[in-house]
Regions:
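Alpha-helical transmembrane signal-anchor/signal-peptide segments
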Residues: 21-40
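Extended terminal
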Residues: 1-3, 15, 30, 169-251
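Outer-membrane beta-barrel architecture
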Residues: 77, 144-148, 207
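N-terminal beta-strand/beta-hairpin edge segment
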Residues: 35-125, 131-133
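Alpha-helical membrane-targeting segments
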Residues: 24-25, 69-73, 218-227
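Transmembrane beta-strands of outer-membrane beta-barrel pores
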Residues: 84, 155-157, 214-216
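N-terminal type II signal-anchor transmembrane helix
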Residues: 1-26
């Protein structure tokens, strides 16, 4: 009986150490939202997914990853690389506490459609390429306690039921220190819409200032920006709004 127990323990240990990705990943994916992994190979520690798709069926490409074995002790150290028709993504993630996640050296270039929020109306289709670098992001309870992000939406456009709206280039910059987030969103002057927004937020509230100002008279453009608020007599839309105990917006 003792020998049998020893054999079972050794077998369990070997199975854990060389756990096939095709066995482990489906259980992980059940907890993930918005992503489907297929054509799995390798182990859970050094694995590959030949096909990565959104739940809507958009194919992103193939992914490889390296996962630290101390995940069994509750500590996650993950390196991930995605490359395919939708673009590429690289990043390193550490999770040493239940409610704290750290991302480092995130670098991506993805089709705008691949980054579309599930809450975006289906009739609106973002076009263009989104490039970004996030050297560091420390999240506590999903809130960015520390953040440094620089993202650019290049050749930005939106397909709408009324037509194709070109937006040029749009830059998003965000930083967070001491739990207070500051972000800006601004266009490059080449598109049909002047975009200028500034945001300040904390776990207690948020504030936004800015406006959307059309550079041309266009029905599709007017319908698009009307989704963000009432259109003023000059055709613009104010983005001024706040909620809770909002911090001040930096100039």
């Amino acid at each position: 009986m003792g020998l049998l127990v020893l054999v079972l323990v050794l077998a369990t240990g070997l199975f854990y150490w060389f756990l096939p990705a095709s066995v482990a990943v489906p259980f992980v994916v059940q907890r993930a939202r918005g992503v489907v992994l297929d054509d799995l190979s390798g182990t859970v520690w050094n694995g590959r997914a030949g096909r990565v798709m959104t739940q809507e069926g958009l194919e992103l490409g193939a992914a490889t990853w390296t996962l630290g074995r101390d995940v069994i002790l509750g500590r996650t150290h993950l390196d991930i690389h995605l490359d395919g028709r939708a673009g590429r993504f690289d990043g390193h993630m550490d999770r040493t506490e239940a409610d704290r996640v750290q991302w480092r050296d995130v670098d991506f270039r993805l089709d705008a459609a691949a980054l579309a929020s599930p809450g975006l109306p289906r009739e609106l289709v973002p076009v263009g390429v989104v490039e970004g670098k996030v050297p560091q992001a420390d999240l506590q309870g999903n809130w960015p306690v520390t953040l440094d992000a620089d993202v650019a939406w290049r050749a930005a456009a939106v397909k709408t039921p009324e037509g194709h709206v070109t937006l040029g280039g749009i830059a998003f910059k965000a930083s967070s220190a001491g739990g207070v987030l500051h972000a800006t969103l601004k266009d490059d002057g080449e598109g049909s819409l002047a975009v200028d927004a500034r945001v300040a937020a904390s776990p207690l509230g948020w504030r936004m200032e800015g406006a959307l100002v059309p550079r041309i008279a266009d029905t599709a453009l007017t319908h698009l920006i009307a989704r963000f608020g009432p259109v003023r007599p000059d055709g613009s839309v104010s983005l001024a709004r706040k909620a809770g105990l909002a911090p001040a917006v930096s100039p």
